[in-house]
């Protein structure tokens, strides 16, 4: 009896998901699959082991800044291209 209930629940959920996909516009689907990755990543610049206290350029880890805003605005840090 439990397995039948589970199968019916999965079946209903699948129809709901299919219904939602059919209502979406093609532009929404194409726009939602793009990943946005910043130019900088949090890094460890001090002695403490678990503390991430600075931001470094993703491509060149030697260029670091105290804040993410400073790192993102650095013209020497190239943006990622896919």
From Swiss-Prot:
Family (UniProt): Belongs to the MEG family.
Functional description taken from the UniProt entry: Maternally-contributed central cell peptide regulating suspensor development and correct auxin distribution in early developing embryos.
Protein name listed in UniProt: EMBRYO SURROUNDING FACTOR 1.2
One Pfam family linked to the record: ESF1
Keyword Membrane tagged: no
Alphabetized UniProt keyword annotations: Developmental protein, Disulfide bond, Signal
Disulfide bonds: 40-56, 45-77, 54-71, 57-64
This protein's record includes keyword Disulfide bond: yes
Protein's organism: Arabidopsis thaliana
Summary of the knockout phenotype: No visible phenotype, due to redundancy with ESF1.1 and ESF1.3. Simultaneous down-regulation of all 3 genes by RNAi induces embryo abnormalities.
